[in-house]
């Protein structure tokens, strides 16, 4: 009778974090991961550096100031009558040919835009990855709690099985069956404890100071994603694809710069030279040009190389869009099937296991079913609830993964 009373007791899931404990919610984890993320700061620094470089690239090169002596005689100095020695000061300025300065500045701005888009894309990837890690940690922790409840119930079953045996009415086989069930429950709890520790370690990659906090008792309420066709059409605006688009812009800027390289740079020099002995001082002006006499082996080859890289950027952009589309299709189908499986577990698997346990409880009270059969049914019910729990986590995980493609918040 005592065994029947124990078996009829309601199964109560472990509550959430104790009162007053600091809880790490789904939103908290995603916010903390973005607040202190070295990868994002590195990209922001790189983008800012490129922006600053664009100003420098649009500016003329620094001029050169020359000081020196010219026509210094090696014999007869200083009594030579035709002394042409001059002490001179000159100013030299290089001027890049064509629109090189403007194009260099535009190229730096394009690179800054690409790095900013990469930072946005990385931010979205981090939100997805920390969300997945949080769901994994929640699922593992909840499963460990459930296994702990099963272990405690089987510990009680062992004690209750011993009571009839002490009065000579019980069966040693029932005690052994209870001990075997307890041993299996302990092993399952230890296995889930390992999984929970690994999940917490993975979460600490994103929130190292907060990964050890308690997690809520329930998963957040996730929204139904937009229709698949609508998400497909929005992939052109996906942050990661935008990075590829801007990378193509950088490659096109490199092509324009390579074409401009055939326009020679100029160097202008103006100088003043003084002579002694009452001789007239002199001024000097000269201009130098680069001569692209090897254009077929240098500038033309550089243009061809940059054109190839620009084609590569375009092909990578197209391939990346295909990759996004394939990932979206897979993520959407995974989310849909996870929902179907969860509904089946809730409406069929768990109710069937509960009905089987209730029937065996009734038979056991009437002396028609063994304790081992009841314990096996009890474990079957817990396994069903464990499956329901795992499928809840799988549905949440697939929804978080899908939010990476929908570019929207995954929950209210």
Place the predicted regions along the sequence by residue.
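Terminal intrinsically disordered/low-complexity segments used for targeting and assembly
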Residues: 1-35, 52, 71, 193-233, ...
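Residues that define the transmembrane beta-barrel architecture of outer-membrane proteins
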Residues: 83-87, 279-283
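Transmembrane beta-barrel strands of outer-membrane/channel proteins
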Residues: 65-71, 268-274
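A glycine-/polar-enriched beta->alpha junction
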Residues: 31-41, 48-63, 78-80, 89-106, ...
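Periplasmic alpha-helical coiled-coil/stalk elements that build and connect Gram-negative outer-membrane
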Residues: 24, 122-237, 331-338
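Amphipathic alpha-helical coiled-coil segments
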Residues: 42-57, 122, 126-147, 156-158, ...
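Amphipathic alpha-helical coiled-coil scaffold segments and their short linker/junction regions
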Residues: 30-36, 174-175, 179, 209-268, ...
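Short, charged, amphipathic alpha-helical segments
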Residues: 105-109, 172-181, 371-379
